[in-house]
Amino acid sequence: MEASKIRLTVPEGIDPSRVLGAGDGVLRALENLVRAQVVARGDSVAVNGDPDEVELVARFFEHAFREAAAGRTLSADDVSRCLAVLRDGEHDASSLRDDVLLSYRGRVIRPKTLGQKRYVDAIRSHTITFGLGPAGTGKTYLAMALAVAALKRHEVGRLVLTRPVVEAGENLGFLPGTLEEKIDPYMRPLYDALFDMMDRERTDELMERGVIEIAPLAYMRGRTLSDAFVVLDEAQNTTPEQMKMFLTRLGFNSKFVITGDLSQRDLVGRRGGLADVERILGRVDDVAFSHLERADVVRHALVGRIVEAYDAYDDAREQRAHDRKESR
């Protein structure tokens, strides 16, 4: 196939460094991810290579120009996410510019992949949403950001954050200390995310007033959760009975988000409540299932490689077990 060449010009009034990144970091990241040569000189960018890739690069720079014109600067990490969206058939990558929450530190929390964007859209448009996927895909963090945003907009009157306490067998009465002291180690990931979004003093005040509640799943039994945004984390560690119990706590003007990763179950010798729930509820109106993939992992790049390595190991182990069974 004959190579294609184009030349792009950074629009007048835009600093090229906003488009190319500090030290041309965006440019270098781009060249590592496309089958095309990209050369920048001054306010001009020349692209040469596979025609489809050249077109992809042109669409990427159209997005980068719009971001720069709006005062935003892409980072090298943004490049792969934008390209993934464009390769997925989206006309442009503006779908990722969907601010969920402005944290008290002034940091904008938004979806960073197309999968995360679809997950956020599912939560917004459904009463109950299941977010399923590996570690690092933002399942819980984005759900909590949407919950905090809903509370700030007075769409709900309270937040309830919960998870099963498998490590303690949920028999917290046998542990020493106050209830808060007993559950704190198991709830710490939820606290950490919450304190990343809201001022610590304000959060403590809302918790004292009962506007924000963080509690083990066992403490949801017998309640009706109305006018609330409820997030159930680590749902792969629920039993089928616990999952049914939780889902039937739904009250009026409430939204439930259930997050989990079936590859990280801590239940031993028991079937989890997340295993069959999609088969049971998959056709129920107003219930959504959002599946996040390895491509949606946005933690340190090494996390994605770790998840991939474990998946490959598990697949190989299952294949060996299957081969042994077939040889008998």
What are these regions (language model features)?
Residues 1-17:
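Short glycine-/aliphatic-rich beta-strand segments at the starts of folded cytosolic domains
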Residues 13, 51-52, 237, 297:
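Short, surface-exposed acidic/glycine-rich loop or hinge patches that mediate macromolecular interfaces
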Residues 15-32:
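Short amphipathic alpha-helix segments
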Residues 19, 57-60, 243-246:
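Hydrophobic side chains in well-ordered alpha-helices
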Residues 32-39:
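A short, structured beta-strand/loop element
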Residues 39-96:
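Interdomain "pre-motor" coupling segment immediately N-terminal to P-loop NTPase/helicase cores
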Residues 44, 104-116, 120-232, 236-328:
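Conserved helicase motor core of SF1/SF2 NTP-dependent helicases
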Residues 83-99, 315-328:
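Intrinsically disordered, low-complexity linkers and terminal tails enriched in Pro/Gly
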